């Protein structure tokens, strides 16, 4: 793995990396985020009693849409043909909702940013739908858990 930054040109200005010479490989990235809230708020999400609707269904769709649009909001991301996006939720305890996003493609560049964007927007959507009853919700941490495929090799959080 290289420590050299690749998003700058000879004039030290930002550029989109040229991936035309890279090999096409299967790539998978998994990201996680969480949102902490009052126990009553999480209970109402679990029971489907939020006035704006089914929070998890809307957040799931928002996460999928965000992954597909990542290249439009992160300036140096490449537009990618994503082959799979999965957003999952877990009630970690009485105050924490965990969000996991898995994004897949077969291409010349990875999908880490798509996975991170997916879980971030899913968490923001939960916040938006519940803010009327709980403005003290906290989003994070958000992190890349793993990525496979590509020139830089595989990454699994916690492994050396």
Curated annotation (Swiss-Prot):
<comment type="similarity">
    <text>Belongs to the MoaC family.</text>
</comment>
<comment type="subunit">
    <text>Homohexamer; trimer of dimers.</text>
</comment>
<dbReference type="InterPro" id="IPR050105">
    <property type="entry name" value="MoCo_biosynth_MoaA/MoaC"/>
</dbReference>
<dbReference type="GO" id="GO:0006777">
    <property type="term" value="P:Mo-molybdopterin cofactor biosynthetic process"/>
</dbReference>
<dbReference type="InterPro" id="IPR047594">
    <property type="entry name" value="MoaC_bact/euk"/>
</dbReference>
<keyword id="KW-0501">Molybdenum cofactor biosynthesis</keyword>
<dbReference type="InterPro" id="IPR023045">
    <property type="entry name" value="MoaC"/>
</dbReference>
<dbReference type="InterPro" id="IPR002820">
    <property type="entry name" value="Mopterin_CF_biosynth-C_dom"/>
</dbReference>
<keyword id="KW-0456">Lyase</keyword>
<protein>
    <recommendedName>
        <fullName>Cyclic pyranopterin monophosphate synthase</fullName>
        <ecNumber>4.6.1.17</ecNumber>
    </recommendedName>
</protein>
<dbReference type="InterPro" id="IPR036522">
    <property type="entry name" value="MoaC_sf"/>
</dbReference>
<feature type="binding site">
    <location>
        <begin position="113"/>
        <end position="114"/>
    </location>
    <ligand>
        <name>substrate</name>
    </ligand>
</feature>
<comment type="pathway">
    <text>Cofactor biosynthesis; molybdopterin biosynthesis.</text>
</comment>
<dbReference type="Pfam" id="PF01967">
    <property type="entry name" value="MoaC"/>
</dbReference>
<comment type="function">
    <text>Catalyzes the conversion of (8S)-3',8-cyclo-7,8-dihydroguanosine 5'-triphosphate to cyclic pyranopterin monophosphate (cPMP).</text>
</comment>
<feature type="active site">
    <location>
        <position position="128"/>
    </location>
</feature>
<dbReference type="GO" id="GO:0061799">
    <property type="term" value="F:cyclic pyranopterin monophosphate synthase activity"/>
</dbReference>
<feature type="binding site">
    <location>
        <begin position="76"/>
        <end position="78"/>
    </location>
    <ligand>
        <name>substrate</name>
    </ligand>
</feature>
